[in-house]
Amino acid sequence: MYKRQTGESVAVKSLKVSAEFSQWLEQHIMLFNSHITHVSGELHKSVWQRFLDGDKEINKGLDMIREAGLLMSSGVANESTQDVIDAMRLNSAGVDILGSELHQPFRDILQPQTTSGVVEAWKAMGAGGGGVVGIIVSDTQYKGKLIDDLTARGWSHIPWQIDYDGVVRSEVSL
């Protein structure tokens, strides 16, 4: 299930993808802790100030992030790996409009990986303050190399897999 906001309402839709697409996601999306952390409020202070000052570029960046979310939702629903990649790229472009400093610590390390074709797309996870980065690797043959390269720079690979059950609550009678 996922929720999609349309105007003032939220539409709830069931989301079921094939085992093959789920496997592609698990094999191509990698998470890393860069150990580069920020105080989120400080990191975003200039963005909020620009927003309050009416900077139209902030609205443009936020609109791009929204479009990226919609494209990602559509990409997953339609099992389009290219849309998933494009959505992550669009999100990163939107974040860069908000403030290049948000991605700068990661960009310095990941740009060569992107230029060389190892990385298709990447983005700071969440608001970016925690230092975790999601990466879409172009081919699974590069995973080991990417892990080696990034751990040599002090980053930690975070293994993950899709949680098909979600939160399961059970009561135990004592």
Regions found by a protein language model. Give the residues of each.
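C-terminal nucleotide
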Residues: 3-123, 134-174
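Short Gly/Ser/Thr- and Asp/Glu-enriched loop/turn motifs at secondary-structure junctions
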Residues: 125-131
